């Protein structure tokens, strides 16, 4: 799908098709941010690294290809909104904001320490580029509904992206918000469900089954895409389709169900719920980086084969 976007810093003048070069650029950016996430957890002593790594591809492509944002003017009225509903994954989100220029790297080096602006949960009153404070799970989609309705009332058009976790979808408030998004025909809402199948207490299926997520959101009135959450091409095509739906006057919000792995890319973390939260010393960080070297090579090889 090739859309003539009229959005953001990258569009239309700097917009490029999703070709091999662009795909590789995003792969390398995601690799850099995964490493940044782990290093930040070392600086801060600990962090919710598992869910941050499972969602990093989503945040990478949004912030580096799609979102209409300006680090020099972070409060511009028509900016796209991003809601990290799984707010505990700030250790992954903060590096994304630093990389885009919303704050200096020095802030990461004091992550979650006394006096730091950024902690385990982001505070929108302290951190440039953060649209809302999150952490109490289940409320991100409700906030996005409010943002979308406010834009409609004020005559301002922007996209509202929400990143939730599958464990978070245990919360009933998500489904009240889903009903509202469909009822008010908020086609500028795109919900990403990070379906990594793990939560703090164990496997999601053992705690509270949420599948089939695609059929559930479809029943709630959403356009639904189910993708490999670690495949940039699949993410790109789903996001482009969601934006096109809105630009073409569609009347449904979009849900993108991302099948992912907790701790993606780090062999001793991957698919292990015990890495929902954890700490790394220098030895573990070195092992993680070595694993990420192999992971990047595998992903770039896939690009060479499929692009």
Per-segment meaning from a language model:
Residues 94-96, 123, 173-175, 201-205, ...:
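Short acidic, glycine/serine/threonine-rich loops at helix termini
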